Structures are given as structure tokens and as C-alpha cells.
Regions:
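Extracellular glycan-interacting surfaces
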Residues: 1-181
Length: 181
């Protein structure tokens, strides 16, 4: 079909291995909200063929995604029930954050008690340069969080508009978030 492609990320060391995060949108409407129609896909042949690697993970709608260039090459993906999930919804966005250390074969939640699921939706997502397996995540409530590989959440910044993207430089420890938009 014509998938709702959000992001494509190459594996840092395996030539031809790609990961894609997708949603339910289609050129001809909206796909049925079932497993296989949204989530994460992996290609091992430069994108010629794709395998669904998001089986059993909910919510399925996946958008922000990043992969750590350091071993074990953690792939982190944020997901929500729909493209329109928001902190303004009754019950909040119901967003989740997942990580795989084996190219999407297995996934584990990076959410703590407060974020399982999260009332805020996750839009900005990048690798934390200060911690292998850690990420920085931006929310639709104007917050940026540092999330460790052990799923410990630390508030880095707040009081901003919705954080749609994050750039963290190599020397980010002294000034954790270099650019937030």
C-alpha cells in the first residue's frame, strides 16, 4: 500500500538495514487500526523489502524515532493511539516510549510510573549524547525530559511551547539541550 511514513533511520553499522516509523494515514484515507498497519518496520536490503517489527506493541501509531550510534545501537520509538493524540484529550495522549537493543526483535517500555502511559504526547526525540541507551524527549506540554536506559526520567526544561524537535550536541552534559524548537 501507501504507508504513512514518518521517519527512516539507518542502522549505524549495518549497511542496508533501515528502520521506519509509520502511522495509519494513506493516500486514499485512513487504514484500519490493526496490527501491521502502523508501527515500526525494518528492511535488511536498502528498503526493497520491509518486515513489521512492532508486533504486540501498543499503541501502534509511531512517529519520533532515533537510533544510538553506540553499541548496542538502541532504537527508541515514541508511540500514541493516533496522529491527533494530545495532552488535551480526556485521559491525556496515552503516549508510550519503547526501546529495542536488537533491531526491533524485542521491545521494552522506557516509561516510568508517571509516564505509563504519558498524558503528554512525545514529539521531539533524540539520542542522549551523555548516556548510551538514553534519550531526550520533548512533549506537547512544553517539557524536555532525559530518559535513562533504566527508564529514569529527569526533567531538563519546561514552560516552552510544544517541543517538536531536539538537537543535543556531543558536549551536552554542561548544557543538556543545545537547541529546542
Amino acid at each position: 500500500g501507501n504507508p504513512d511514513l514518518h521517519m527512516i533511520s539507518p542502522h549505524p553499522t549495518k549497511r542496508g538495514v533501515l528502520f521506519a516509523s509509520t502511522g495509519y494515514g494513506r493516500l486514499d484515507g485512513v487504514a484500519e487500526m490493526i496490527e501491521g498497519n502502523a508501527g515500526v518496520f525494518r528492511s535488511q536490503d536498502f528498503g526493497n523489502n520491509w518486515d513489521y517489527v512492532w508486533s504486540g506493541v501498543t499503541p501502534r501509531y509511531s512517529r519520533p524515532m532515533c537510533i544510538d550510534s553506540r553499541d548496542p545501537f538502541s532504537l527508541t520509538v515514541a508511540s500514541a493511539p493516533t496522529a491527533f493524540s494530545s495532552f488535551k484529550d480526556e485521559g491525556g495522549a496515552q503516549a508510550m516510549l519503547f526501546r529495542s537493543d536488537n533491531e526491533g526483535q524485542d521491545w521494552r517500555s522506557l516509561c516510568d510510573e508517571k509516564h505509563s502511559p504519558s498524558a503528554a504526547n512525545f514529539h521531539g526525540l533524540t539520542v542522549d549524547p551523555d548516556e548510551i541507551g538514553g534519550v531526550l524527549v520533548g512533549t506537547d506540554t512544553g517539557e524536555v525530559w532525559s530518559v535513562s536506559k533504566e527508564a529514569t526520567w529527569t526533567l531538563v526544561a519546561e514552560g516552552m511551547p510544544a517541543v517538536l524537535s531536539i538537537f543535543a550536541g556531543e558536549e551536552a552534559l554542561s548544557e543538556k539541550v543545545k537547541s529546542v524548537t
